[in-house]
Regions:
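Long, aromatic- and glycine/proline-rich binding clefts that accommodate carbohydrate-like moieties
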Residues: 32-33, 46, 351-360, 409-473, ...
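Short, polar/charged alpha-helical segment
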Residues: 32-38, 55-73, 170, 174, ...
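Glycine-centered hinge/linker elements that transmit conformational signals in sensory
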Residues: 201-207, 244-308, 358
Length: 549
């Protein structure tokens, strides 16, 4: 490919696809000319990358790969597959020592794994040394909102954010605004129907719609939606910060320290245990409360079929128009719920629903993380040959470049750059997205965070969640019994990680002590509250947004 051909293609893409950008057309073209120039050594090379199948990555795989090839002459095979399969593929490449993919867009939930393994490229050093000649001068790392989530304990960057989405509270704003429903709720519960600030209010609202209202416009309605099938997706339902929402961990951002939302205690970077007996919080009163409430609401207030659903089957339900609220909802599905054909939007696709701050459990305290945020981030492995790694790094930077990123945001609604979030184009779209713009423009985006550095091997530990949570859902175990077994298994696996060895900061388990010793210490694990059911508290949607600041 000649530079002239690449420049002509770049002009076409800027004019016809990358119309929205925080850069001027001239600045966009200058950025693309840099890609054309540095791509010369990699002409006709085909690189392979893989990611999970959300809308943002579909756009990359089906549109941005073509743009990148047209402009640079580098071919890209961008596969999309299930999230757990992405992790499996990465693990396989590391274990075999054979290059399978040249780059991965993987969850930053693995940051504790990557930092300890010694198998992942440290991007901070890479862009200063062997990757310096292929690092975009206008990359502008300070513009990324999620770097604290992809940084190791050594202060080095191990992953570059490609997309982000949070897990927030979702509710039918139109129903909550109806005078008849507001009056009926207040007459029963003694306070206003509004955005719940705590789990007690969420439970009251769930009870109200499921058991008191029952039908709206002739349709049976429910005050809660969730899923409960014994399935790997049940793990995300809990590992994606359910325990932190209940208040099980310690204060600290992006994750609680020394005890995080997985209940794992860390001392001097070494995980020392998840069970209360070892100083962890995985079977603490707060964790048991979290599991008990999850099951109780699922059984009492959700549609009867929900308990047998996995995440995939449960996703479309709130769009069908008979769910009043959902405490655990990923903003990655915002675009899906703006379809004008759905009963949850008007004929123009304007939402009848809103997203708002997640209500807090009884053990939650100010200074703790408030919920979960997913960060899919570019990850390079050391066993990828340098020339292929460089070419993949070019593609990674292309899809997050300022030329491309705003257009990608408007397609996938998974923001990564401050400049895009504050752009006029994002402002114009705000009324279509039910609170997404307001969330990402607030400081709240720093309090909804991914799994952090306390988790030393995410792939090896993650299935513990769904295996043991399911014991409580099926009724074979109480919540306490299930969490006791889970904590014991987590400790066992931490010990196995220590035996297998890690390059640094491997687990060093505490010797077990009487649980009362740890429960009497400050912070997590926290002793059982005398009252886990404080009075319900709600606020208006407008006031709830102020909480984000």
């Amino acid at each position: 490919m000649t530079c002239a051909a690449g420049r002509k293609d770049a002009q076409w893409w800027i004019t016809n696809e990358f119309v929205e950008s925080t850069l001027s057309k001239e600045e966009q073209l200058n950025e693309m000319e840099w890609f054309i120039s540095v791509a010369k050594p990699f002409q006709n090379l085909t690189i392979r990358v893989v990611s999970e199948p959300i809308a943002t990555h579909w756009y990359e795989a089906n549109v941005l790969t073509k743009a990148f090839t047209d402009i640079t002459g580098i071919n890209v095979v961008h596969e999309t597959t299930a999230e757990d399969d992405v992790v499996t593929k990465m693990e396989t490449q590391i274990e075999l020592g054979v290059n399978i993919y040249d780059a991965y867009i993987g969850d930053s939930d693995l940051i504790g794994t990557h930092f300890r393994s010694g198998k992942v490229v440290n991007l901070t050093d890479f862009i200063k040394n062997e990757g310096k000649d292929v690092t975009l001068p206008s990359l502008d790392l300070d513009d990324f909102i999620g770097l604290s989530f992809t940084t190791g304990l050594d202060g080095k960057l191990y992953q570059l954010p490609d997309q982000q989405f949070a897990n927030l509270y979702w509710y039918r704003h139109d129903w909550f605004s109806r005078p008849d429903l507001k009056a009926k709720f207040k007459s029963i519960y003694g306070y206003e129907l509004g955005v719940p600030e705590n789990w007690s209010a969420y439970e009251d609202i769930a009870d109200f719609f499921t058991n008191k209202v029952k039908k709206i416009d002739g349709i049976t309605v429910y005050g809660h939606m969730d899923y409960g099938k014994k399935d790997p997706s049940l793990a995300w339902r809990f590992s994606d910060a359910w325990l932190s929402m209940a208040g099980a961990g310690d204060k600290g951002l992006p994750n609680g320290m020394p005890v995080d939302e997985w209940g794992i205690r860390v001392i001097d970077c070494h995980p020392v245990g998840a069970s209360v007996a070892r100083g962890g919080a995985l079977n603490s009163p707060a964790a048991v409360y979290a599991l008990r409430k999850y099951k109780e609401w699922l059984v009492k207030f959700a549609p009867p079929e929900a308990i047998n659903m996995d995440e995939r089957l449960s996703l479309p339900i709130i769009g069908q128009g008979n769910i009043a609220q959902q405490i655990f909802w990923y903003t990655a599905y915002t675009a899906i719920l703006t379809d004008p054909s759905l009963p949850v939007t008007d004929s123009d696709g304007i939402p009848k629903w809103r997203m708002a701050p997640s209500p807090k459990g009884a053990y939650w305290e100010p200074g703790m993380k408030m919920g979960y945020q997913d960060v899919g981030a570019w990850t390079l492995l050391k066993n990828t040959p340098l020339n292929r790694r460089k070419a993949a790094w070019l593609y990674a930077q292309f899809v997050v470049s300022k030329t491309v990123s705003l257009r990608k945001l408007l397609v996938g609604l998974t923001p990564i750059r401050k400049s895009d979030i504050n752009s006029e184009a994002f402002s114009k779209a705000a009324n279509r997205y039910g609170g997404l713009v307001e969330f990402y423009r607030s400081n709240a985006r720093n309090s909804w965070t991914p799994t952090g550095l306390n988790v030393p091997n995410y792939p090896f530990l993650s299935d513990v969640w769904w295996i043991y949570v399911s014991l409580a859902i099926t009724g074979t175990h109480s919540a306490q019994q299930a969490m006791n077994k889970m904590a014991q298994e987590m400790d066992n696996r931490l010990q196995q990680i220590a035996i297998n060895g890690q390059e640094r900061c491997e687990p060093r388990l505490n010797k077990p002590k009487d649980e009362n010793y740890w429960l009497s210490q400050p912070g997590a694990p926290k002793p059982k509250l005398s009252n886990e059911e404080p009075p319900g508290k709600t606020t208006s949607y407008e006031e709830s947004l102020k909480a984000w600041d």
